Regions:
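Flexible "arm" and connector segments at domain edges
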Residues: 1-143
């Protein structure tokens, strides 16, 4: 594998997008919230939807440049949405918990179970990610 001089971490990516949001006077929250205005929710959703559609079109054409562009834009918009919800300090732990949960989908022999379309199915070892614990563990500890 070649050494890439530009290996960004998730938190660095989120911080770059925070800088963009602050420079363009777009919302960045420091406290977690599920409450966005209807306008902001729809904007975030529509931006993600648009990039997903651009990815599909590029993939269907086999255009790797446009695929990379769409994926980069998806990540950028996702980072902005993380900042909009004030989840920037929790999202890495959330991702790690989802990873642990997803790996629990392997069966008792360490083998994946697939649906006909290729989707990975849950085994009897599966456990649901405990996102609530991650989001509120500091608050609970302070009480």
């Amino acid at each position: 594998m070649s050494e890439n001089k530009s290996q960004l971490t998730l938190l660095q990516s989120i911080d770059y997008v925070r800088e963009f949001h602050e420079s363009f006077q777009l919302p960045v929250r420091n406290e977690m919230t599920a409450e966005l205005s209807e306008k902001e929710m729809l904007l975030r959703f529509n931006l993600m939807k648009e990039e997903n559609e651009e990815y599909l079109e590029a993939a269907q054409r086999g255009d790797i440049v446009e695929i990379a562009d769409a994926l980069g834009d998806m990540l950028y918009i996702l980072c902005g949405t993380i900042n909009a919800h004030g989840l920037q300090l929790k999202i890495a732990e959330v991702f790690e918990e989802i990873q642990r949960s997803n790996m629990s989908k392997l069966d008792e022999n360490g083998k994946p179970i697939f649906r006909e379309d290729g989707k990975v199915l849950k085994s009897n070892k599966y456990f649901k990610p405990d996102i609530k614990k991650i989001l509120f563990q500091q608050e609970d500890a302070a009480m």
